[in-house]
């Protein structure tokens, strides 16, 4: 019997080779872009690195007319506002995610979830304008003044809430950042909580566990990696936020007090305010070094989150 021809020709290896080359090229482009950013930041900031050295990191003074620059105030403002934002946003986001996945009635889950996603879509400049013209005056009258009167006489803690109630400042910027990152963290937490197998939760309820026990002993252990990822996503958003912080932080290079009520500055705000007006080469180099510092901070945060997730996975496997 004569051999019949196949209905179609089998695919050759040429397509696989082309696909493999394209995928590798895409990965290489990502690495080249990352390396290019790092190299360009180092080259552009080199005059500042040569002149100020490591002292740039802990010098408070920023005097553009005299070409004296220090990054301590922007670094302090960036880290403190981000910490305040996380301190507020994480528990609120945790509560929102748990309510949506465990407690909310069916008719409320979808509209509330859409509302959270819409909050994440609001441009940061809108948050900044709202924070400056609406939030800051109310914050000064209804929070800063009464809390300052109560807390200012308490040793150590009182120093954080002392001084005049401007409305704007480091604390106000941290609160605005918290409002901005809550939708991101809450959305990620909600999605990872929904990945918990229903059978595990129903089995826990079946043996008499309360809702809190199910959340604490079933949902959280199963989703802890995703929860950490959501928190780090929010932290990265807070570290890199520019416009909203620029509106509300005060934009001053002063660090004479530990009070959170005082105006300050952040790395992103300094770059946004001064880059277009920088004239001298050293001024531009100092601003580029601020960008390099922000890049390093972001890299450290990412590396720490990856290390934490790896440790959690290792400990889970050892049980």
Swiss-Prot record:
Domain ABC transmembrane type-1: 75-305
Gene3D superfamilies the UniProt entry points to: MetI-like
Positions in the Periplasmic compartment: 45-74, 138-167, 253-283
Transmembrane segments: 25-44, 75-94, 118-137, 168-187, 233-252, 284-303
GO biological process: phosphate ion transmembrane transport; response to radiation
Subcellular compartments: Cell inner membrane
Segments in the Cytoplasmic topological domain: 1-24, 95-117, 188-232, 304-319
GO terms under cellular component: ATP-binding cassette (ABC) transporter complex, substrate-binding subunit-containing; membrane; plasma membrane
Cysteine pairings via disulfide bonds: none
Alphabetical list of InterPro entries matching this protein: MetI-like, MetI-like_sf, Phosphate_PstC, Phosphate_Transport_Permease
Keyword entries, A-Z: Cell inner membrane, Cell membrane, Membrane, Phosphate transport, Transmembrane, Transmembrane helix, Transport
An example Gene Ontology molecular-function term: phosphate transmembrane transporter activity
Mode of membrane association: Multi-pass membrane protein
NCBIfam families: phosphate_pstC, PRK11275.1
Family: Belongs to the binding-protein-dependent transport system permease family. CysTW subfamily.
The protein's role, per its UniProt record: Part of the binding-protein-dependent transport system for phosphate; probably responsible for the translocation of the substrate across the membrane.
The name this protein goes by in its record: Phosphate transport system permease protein PstC
